[in-house]
């Protein structure tokens, strides 16, 4: 998919790089081959990368909802990448989805230009265009700024690590599928080497590249879920380990997994912080080639539609990525469910109380884990951290009257 399609058709013209910002976005409804009709948003920003923006807006959206940015692979379109299952999951779990789309004028095979310095630098090119799409969503919908995530396949996966490194202040989580580390390549020639056999650097060297994406930044960094097929002959599986090395070092943790298990029969590893917060995870899909793993069906953990580079392997990557982000289920924390006089504690789920009270859900975790799971924003994180301590386990309560979480059972704001 990627190796034969990475060549750029033409370098951008100065005119395209300096496209104008219009006062109001133009909205166009399109369907194409989309499972759900996507809406195109034009004039969403200065758009220096000359990308197109499509969005999926589920019905009945609550205030302060999450946002997922999903980046297609080479030769694909926004509509085609809906087959990954994100729109359907957004309908069920109530989050918005933005699908950036490459144009052939930028790259003849519609690959995001993850190897071009002018497109992978903060404040420039395609990276800035994608960030402006997020800004547009925040301006026009009720988006929780602490629950914005990015994922992608192949060239879109490489661009995913670009966004994680250059905009850690925007994205709370990232999930590259069949991609590699940030700045694995900075030219078309080096891109081929990066893809296969791959580039070997020390964790510290990779981490320095990621930190250089936004020099001097000291805020929360995005957690990352890294997926790869063991039989991927387009982007070598070695890239998965290099990405682990980059982002574990970026987070200041070691490269020894704290959890090694299987999910759906496939190897899964988790790398945690000193206080037990999952920061990096990997899924290695044994025997899978180059593509996004899906599991078509109607089960709670099933999603996606098989197609070109959308591979039915009986595990839906989008579902498990959503769990890791904390926008599907409990994001790996502990939840207490009360029904009558019976209290049950379970992991990785968020459940509803049946008692008559102002709140409808309660879950206990450290203040840091509440933030990682997306229940509180940065301001609330700092308030609660100062109030209780960042590694202190506290209950939070979901209150419909607040359309969000609070530390007070009477539903007073944080």
Swiss-Prot record:
Pfam families, A to Z: Esterase_PHB
Source organism, top-level taxon: Bacteria
One of the record's GO cellular component terms: extracellular region
Keywords: Hydrolase, Lipid degradation, Lipid metabolism, Secreted, Signal
Annotated signal peptide: 1-37
Major localization class: secreted
GO biological process assignments: lipid catabolic process
The keyword Signal is assigned to this record: yes
One term of GO molecular function: hydrolase activity
Family matches, as InterPro entries: AB_hydrolase_fold (IPR029058), Esterase_phb (IPR010126), Plant_Biomass_Hydrol_Est (IPR050955)
Keyword set includes Lipid metabolism: yes
Enzyme superclass (EC): hydrolase
Compartments, record wording: Secreted
Active site per database record: 154 (charge relay system)
EC identifiers of the protein: 3.1.1.-
Family named by the database record: Belongs to the AB hydrolase superfamily. Lipase family.
Entry function: Specific for poly(hydroxyalkanoic acid) consisting of monomers of four or five carbon atoms and for P-nitrophenylbutyrate as substrates.
Protein name per its UniProtKB record: Poly(3-hydroxyalkanoate) depolymerase C
Annotated organism of origin: Paucimonas lemoignei (Pseudomonas lemoignei)
Classification lineage: Bacteria, Pseudomonadati, Pseudomonadota, Betaproteobacteria, Burkholderiales
């Amino acid at each position: 998919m990627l190796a034969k399609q990475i060549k750029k058709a033409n370098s951008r013209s100065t005119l395209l790089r300096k496209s104008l910002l219009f006062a109001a976005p133009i909205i166009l409804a399109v369907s194409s081959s989309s499972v759900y009709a996507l809406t195109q948003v034009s004039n969403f920003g200065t758009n220096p990368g000359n990308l197109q923006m499509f969005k999926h807006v589920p019905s009945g959206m609550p205030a302060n909802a999450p946002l997922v940015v999903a980046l297609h692979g080479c030769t694909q379109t926004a509509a085609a990448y809906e087959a990954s299952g994100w729109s359907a999951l957004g309908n069920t779990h109530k989050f918005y989805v933005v699908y950036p789309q490459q144009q052939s004028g930028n790259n003849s095979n519609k690959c995001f230009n993850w190897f071009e310095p002018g497109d992978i630098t903060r404040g420039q090119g395609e990276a800035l265009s994608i960030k402006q799409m997020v800004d547009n969503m925040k301006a026009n919908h009720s988006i929780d700024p602490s629950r914005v995530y990015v994922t992608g396949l192949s060239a879109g996966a490489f661009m995913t690590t670009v966004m994680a490194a250059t905009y850690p202040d925007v994205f709370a989580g990232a999930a590259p599928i069949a991609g590699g580390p940030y700045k694995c390549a900075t030219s078309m020639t080096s891109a081929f080497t990066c893809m296969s056999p791959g580039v070997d650097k020390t964790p510290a060297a990779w981490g320095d590249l990621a930190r250089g994406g936004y020099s001097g930044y000291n805020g929360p960094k995005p957690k990352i879920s890294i997926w790869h097929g063991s039989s991927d002959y387009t982007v070598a599986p070695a890239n998965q380990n290099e990405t682990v090395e980059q982002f574990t070092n970026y987070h200041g943790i070691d490269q020894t997994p704290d959890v090694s298990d299987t999910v759906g029969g496939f190897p899964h590893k988790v790398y945690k912080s000193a206080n037990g917060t999952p920061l990096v995870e990997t899924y290695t899909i044994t025997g899978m080639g180059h593509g996004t793993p899906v599991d078509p069906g109607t089960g709670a953990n099933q999603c996606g539609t098989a197609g070109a580079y959308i591979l039915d392997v009986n595990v839906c990557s989008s579902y498990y990525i959503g769990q890791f982000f904390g926008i599907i289920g409990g994001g790996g924390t502990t939840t207490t469910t009360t029904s009558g006089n019976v209290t049950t504690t379970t992991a990785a789920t968020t459940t509803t109380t049946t008692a008559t009270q102002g709140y409808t859900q309660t879950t206990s975790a450290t203040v840091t884990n509440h933030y990682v799971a997306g229940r509180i924003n940065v301001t609330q994180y700092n308030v609660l951290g100062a109030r209780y301590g960042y590694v202190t386990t506290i209950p939070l309560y979901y209150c419909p009257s607040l359309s969000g979480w609070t530390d007070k059972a009477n539903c007073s704001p944080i």
